[in-house]
Amino acid sequence: MFKKKLFSIILTLALTACASATPPPTVAPASAAAPSGNLVIYSGRSEALIKPVIEKFKAKYPAVTVALKAGSNSELANALIEEKTNPQADVFVATELMTLQSLADRGVFEAHKSANLKDVSSQYQHPDGLWTGLTLRARVIMYNTDLVKADDAPKSIFDLANPKWKGQIAAAGSANGSLQAQVAEMRQLLGDEKAQKWLTDLKANDVKFFGGHTDVRKAVGAGEFKIGLVNHYYYHLQVAEKSKVAVIYPDQGKEELGLIVNATGAGVIKGAKNLNNAKAFVDYLLSAEGQEIFAQLNYEYPLRKDAPLHKDVAPLTNYRIAVFDVVKV
């Protein structure tokens, strides 16, 4: 089974609600012919978040027929490993980079260095082109303003363990890639003991763990819970539904952890039946147009330096960011 080190920490706390050598990559040239045929996408991202960019890709390349299989990162990673000798997917879109790195270590991905990577920080690229980051997400605390005053809202992720919030906090469970990435990053920055204590404290504080962040944001927006731990764009999606919610970008004090930010990403499947289409799709995700879709429709932070941020999203430069090695988490 596909597992990461942090699974043993999260799963034992019952938080959930429900290499072979790689050939040197070459920079992808512009294709002489427009993509056509089929494209099978496995996505650890929810259909609602990945479908807009797929629809734009299809509009750009109408000769391509796209099939999307959405699920959890771990489920799809297991499938990719099981299908390695007979790949059923052409490209995998993941909610975080740990899964991509683990699959790269297992020889699942084909090297592909998109020409668009020149506009993406090397921090979010595999050195051999086996995967690339796509967008960034900040881990934030959202709260219902009818139930929590701004001065009382938690300012740190560690405040979520305060007994005053017992039974009043919602979060995504252990199957969620963003939580997994956050815990892995905390382990790297703070050590196993402190990261595990944080998880234990959340459990002791009767945090309600949902299957995904959409359920979390809606529960907070409806006043079923006072506080939610989410990716920043879920706050903006809830604001768009006219809910009375506000957001804290946590741990900004001088001696505090800093804002945890993680990345989505994608990799082309080695031996894919529609290899050229898979590469064209990754190229599109990294294009100025693709990045703008993520930013403007999903409120995400684009990785391209020239892609505009949504006007309602605060720039990451406003915050002190927790610095970690995205590959080693």
List the predicted regions and their residue ranges.
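Short, low-complexity disordered leader/linker segments with a strong preference
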Residues: 1-38
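Short, polar/charged alpha-helical segment
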Residues: 35, 40-65, 81, 141, ...
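A bilobed periplasmic-binding-protein/Venus flytrap-type ligand-binding module shared by bacterial periplasmic
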Residues: 142-147, 261-274, 293
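Periplasmic-binding protein-like
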Residues: 167-174, 284-305
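Extracytoplasmic ligand-binding site segments that recognize negatively charged/polar headgroups
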Residues: 43-51, 71-74, 87-225, 257
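A ligand-binding cleft/hinge motif common to bilobed small-molecule-binding domains
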Residues: 98-102, 221, 226-247, 298
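An extracytoplasmic/periplasmic, membrane-proximal ligand-sensing/linker region
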Residues: 192-197, 302-329
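Short amphipathic alpha-helical coupling segments at ligand-binding clamshell hinges
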Residues: 53, 194, 198, 231, ...
